[in-house]
Amino acid sequence: AWYPGQAGGTAIANVLFGDYNPAGRLPVTFYKSTNQLPDFEDYSMKGRTYRYMTEAPLFPFGHGLSYTTFQYGNASLNTPEIKDGEQVTLTIPVSNTGKYDGEEVVQIYLRRPGDKEGPSHALRAFKRVAIAKGTTNQVTIPLSKENFEWFDTGTNTCLLYTSDAAD
């Protein structure tokens, strides 16, 4: 329940007794043990945070529970490229396959294929949507050019990562 505040007891009871269907997501990674963490004096990012983990954590960044279940369909883009000042729209069909109405937090993680030094993936966008039981919503998430930029240590700036069809 993290830091639930003065109404925390009531909120937790509502979840436990099924009066509220939770949809929150973890803002941090929970490691299985301290053995998964690098030495405290090692300032490398390897093995730290969800973006650099190489082992499976106990609960990853973005993990959450619900009293219902969701199934994702195949995502599609409205265009294969982004021009300056424009956006692409990612559309993902999300179905509520469970017994209860619920909310899902659709999370968009991007990675740079072949990158051995940078993060394995990074959260770039998300959208919380209410989906009635037995229905499918077409969730649309706009992505700008900045969503595809990565920090470059050589120039100390964010640069647009481009790839070819092989990536």
Give the residues covered by each predicted segment.
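Short glycine/proline/serine/threonine-rich loop/turn segments at secondary-structure transition edges
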Residues: N147-L160
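Secreted, periplasmic, or luminal enzymes acting at the cell surface/secretory milieu
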Residues: A1-E103, Q107-L110
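Short, contiguous acidic/charged loop-to-helix segments that flank catalytic cores in large enzymes
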Residues: A1-P4, P80, F126-A132, N156
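Intrinsically disordered, low-complexity Pro/Gly/Ser/Thr-rich segments with frequent PxxP/GP/PP motifs
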Residues: G118-W150
